[in-house]
Amino acid sequence: MGPLQFRDVAIEFSLEEWHCLDTAQRNLYRNVMLENYSNLVFLGIVVSKPDLIAHLEQGKKPLTMKRHEMVANPSVICSHFAQDLWPEQNIKDSFQKVILRRYEKRGHGNLQLIKRCESVDECKVHTGGYNGLNQCSTTTQSKVFQCDKYGKVFHKFSNSNRHNIRHTEKKPFKCIECGKAFNQFSTLITHKKIHTGEKPYICEECGKAFKYSSALNTHKRIHTGEKPYKCDKCDKAFIASSTLSKHEIIHTGKKPYKCEECGKAFNQSSTLTKHKKIHTGEKPYKCEECGKAFNQSSTLTKHKKIHTGEKPYVCEECGKAFKYSRILTTHKRIHTGEKPYKCNKCGKAFIASSTLSRHEFIHMGKKHYKCEECGKAFIWSSVLTRHKRVHTGEKPYKCEECGKAFKYSSTLSSHKRSHTGEKPYKCEECGKAFVASSTLSKHEIIHTGKKPYKCEECGKAFNQSSSLTKHKKIHTGEKPYKCEECGKAFNQSSSLTKHKKIHTGEKPYKCEECGKAFNQSSTLIKHKKIHTREKPYKCEECGKAFHLSTHLTTHKILHTGEKPYRCRECGKAFNHSATLSSHKKIHSGEKPYECDKCGKAFISPSSLSRHEIIHTGEKP
């Protein structure tokens, strides 16, 4: 068996046959010949360019070529090597199948095969589709073979034989690099690009490169907005048929892929594979920029955009930009109010399927992920990861504007809005806007009047569980958060954070109206109401109005006469915790609030504020 040459895998047309082809068919021929050649080059079988390929690349007719001109310089790889790559079939047949396969992809109605012509006058185009394959012979094959399983038609026995391998479990084409096997040679060729890193298909719109032309075609639909694959059940549309196929499983409710470790079931095997890495702790995908590792390649791809800062997806409604198209799609629902994902247990609806999935765990009550440091258990591994930062003190997310660092990226995102003034989450009831959706959710409970969280100690009720947790510390006297500067302790971490600014003197929040600066954004917001004279909080008992809801709450106690805050030192009772805190300083002699002008110290910030008016001459 001699050395393999390009002419062994080339398809030839006579002059009469060439004239029978229309423009699209001639282009198809050119593409197939060029593809056959590139595949041989890829395998190292062809070492020089045949004249036929040079002519085709220049757009010339192949008819000017003679048979002997197709011969490339002899290859050092003989066809014995080729037979090892193609067990049970000849390399020539493997490439000659491409023309027929390409025609089949054009669809039944558009399939046109050329009959053998005796002369130009007798030449006819056969358009009978698959049913007519038995009635004619093509330019390259003379017999017709049919698949017993699905009736697919082939013009060579080897092509038919190769097709039948698909119905068996045989995978004769093995990758030398990693050992992975495939049932088609073309799939092996495609697979090899993973090892070479070759990405020859580039998007003209954004410059992104792909290994496969099909992936590029799918990607282009992101820019055009085209979603040709539509679900018959819910009308949801997708850019790729594979995504539609995965989506359709949701409607069946089937979850055949079950995790042996925790029993969780999935509707896709790929999702189960990803899930298993949670249990193994495997993170094979590492970021070259920062060294962070991930258990999924898609997560690494998403992560890389943090370093590039790329945000190509912009909301037409508010101008906000996003790294990923799916996040933009979810974001748009904030503006439309659409919440398509509903919980079957409690009826609560969500804008994202991921939020619904997390919510559903609440009903299950399972907490698989336990903190080794404190024993606290969590429903999700991601929440455990975030929780661990409480113990380590790690704050990896830093604000470029003011340098403040945060434990969580979501907290940084919300914080940034304090600099921009952006408040995208608006209450439909009163029009009040917020920087975070969670703050809006908490606020909305105020309008319902519900206070489901009740203190067993004093009977006081709250509309948020977190508020009850904070309140309970008043009764226990627990103050776990201590200031390293002065030793003062607090029952809330947020109170300690606010307190620390007293020592640093930092006042990053400035009023544009009068120039007064504050160490907390919330204090600035409260202050601004002095200029607007806005008093939205009104007492139902006496009609008195207040700038702040906290002032109204404090005021209401005057009507009830309630004094739940008692000093352990002298037994005196107060209706506000802040008043009790100020009172305690009388016993301790502590005066932490000092006047910058004269050095006089006070036990409370309000006393200092009143004193400072002496220096300014301000008459409120």
Swiss-Prot record:
Its main location: nucleus. Residues 4-75 form the KRAB domain. A zinc finger (C2H2-type) spans 145-167, 173-195, 201-223, 229-251, 257-279, 285-307, 313-335, 341-363, 369-391, 397-419, 425-447, 453-475, 481-503, 509-531, 537-559, 565-587, 593-615. It is found in: Nucleus. Coiled coil: none annotated. SUPFAM superfamilies: beta-beta-alpha zinc fingers (SSF57667), KRAB domain (Kruppel-associated box) (SSF109640). InterPro entries: KRAB (IPR001909), KRAB_dom_sf (IPR036051), Znf_C2H2_sf (IPR036236), Znf_C2H2_type (IPR013087). GO terms for cellular component: nucleoplasm; nucleus. GO terms for biological process: regulation of transcription by RNA polymerase II; transposable element silencing. Keywords: DNA-binding, Metal-binding, Nucleus, Repeat, Repressor, Transcription, Transcription regulation, Zinc, Zinc-finger. It holds the Pfam family zf-H2C2_2. One of its GO terms (molecular function) is DNA-binding transcription factor activity. Transcription factor specifically required to repress long interspersed nuclear element 1 (L1) retrotransposons: recognizes and binds L1 sequences and repress their expression by recruiting a repressive complex containing TRIM28/KAP1. Not able to repress expression of all subtypes of L1 elements. Binds to the 5' end of L1PA4, L1PA5 and L1PA6 subtypes, and some L1PA3 subtypes. Does not bind to L1PA7 or older subtypes nor at the most recently evolved L1PA2 and L1Hs. 50% of L1PA3 elements have lost the ZNF93-binding site, explaining why ZNF93 is not able to repress their expression. ZNF93 is only present in primates and evolved to repress the primate L1 lineage until 12.5 million years. Evolution stopped when the L1PA3-subfamily of retrotransposons, that escape repression by ZNF93 through the removal of the ZNF93-binding site, appeared. Confers resistance to ET-743 (trabectedin, Yondelis) and PM00104 (Zalypsis), 2 marine derived compounds with antitumor activity in cancer cell lines. Belongs to the krueppel C2H2-type zinc-finger protein family. This is Zinc finger protein 93. It comes from Homo sapiens. The lineage of its organism: Eukaryota, Metazoa, Chordata, Craniata, Vertebrata.
